[in-house]
Structure formats: C-alpha cells, structure tokens
Amino acid sequence: MAYDFKKEFRELYRPSGKPSVVTVPPMSYVAVRGKGNPNTEGGEYQNALPLLYGVAYTIKMSKKGPREIEGYFDFVVPPLEGFWWQDRTDGEIDYARKDDFNFISCIRLPDFVTREDFDWAVSEAAVKKKLDFSAVELLRVDEGLCVQCMHTGPYDDEPATIDAMRTFAAERGYAPDFSEARLHHEIYLSDPRKCAPEKLKTVIRHPIKLI
C-alpha cells in the first residue's frame, strides 16, 4: 500500500476544528513562487499548479521507468499547500487585497528525494508536459512551533478561524511569529472545482512563539 502522508502525519493534515499547538518537523517541497490573485484565469498561481503536479507525479511514477531512486517507496501525492504573505504587513493576510498576494505554492516530497533526483524529475516533466519548468524549486521548510486549525467553508471566511487561532494562542502565552521564513500556511484538502464552498476543508497554520 502506498505511503500516505495525510494518514502518517494525521496531526498535521487532519487537525480538528478547534485550534491546537503543534511542532512541525522540517519538510521538503516542490515549489513555485509567484504574485497576484489566485483566482485569476491564466495568472501565476494557476500556471504554477501543473508544474508542481508534474514534478510530484514524475517522482512517484519513477518506479515504472529506468530511473532508480535510492530509498524510494511508493506514496500518495500529498495535497497542495501554499505559503502566503503581502508586502508591508505584519504577516496577517488582508483577504480584500488578493491582487497583492505573494505566494509559494508547493507539494510535499518524501525525504528520499535528493537534489539530483529532483533535477532529473524536473527535466523529465518538462519533456513530457512541454512546459517551462524553470520556476520550479526544491524547498526545505522548518516551520517549528505553530498554531493550526481545520477551516471548513469558503476561503474568504478564513478570518473567523484565524481570529479563533489567535485568541487560543494568546490565552496560552503565545504570540504570532511571522517572518520571511515563517508565513501564513494553508493546506488544501478539498478540490474547489469539485466541492461546494461551504464544504471546503483547509488546514490553516501560523507560526508562534512563547511570550
């Protein structure tokens, strides 16, 4: 049976609808950086998605080709994730200013993926998909101490969940700890093309520190 990160790291991918404090281990991602409204047809965000999935599935399906990746095990491609921020803010997101978004869109990779394996997968995907993969990067993220919560509903309703997270953290002696390396983080467990807005499930995660 294929290794499923959502099941093996349930605390990180399937939190409850109540805020909780977690310590997130370092993880590797295939990532693309960009700017702008994620809902814009043909925008940077939507153009990033086939690149991410192209690399992730090339690595997963390497078992059927001549490439032998040391330590390989079959895995379920993890869900799409995103790190978001806006310039000249304290790390909080203003959902009314979608055109001002900066993002790192990404998909988690197994730790067996080396730089050499990653570069091979990018080259393979570029040939198969006939797309420009030059924006793709191998990213290592160490989030550490965070507060997180499962948000159910439209993306624009996330501020209510974030308010609950902020209150929960403050009551326990934590403060936000946003920086260039520690950002607003979302994990998308639902496909908005196939799921009603009120049923969308999104993990929201914010970096924190003890006061």
Question: Regions from the language model: what does each represent?
Answer:
Residues 1-211:
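A solvent-exposed interaction/effector surface
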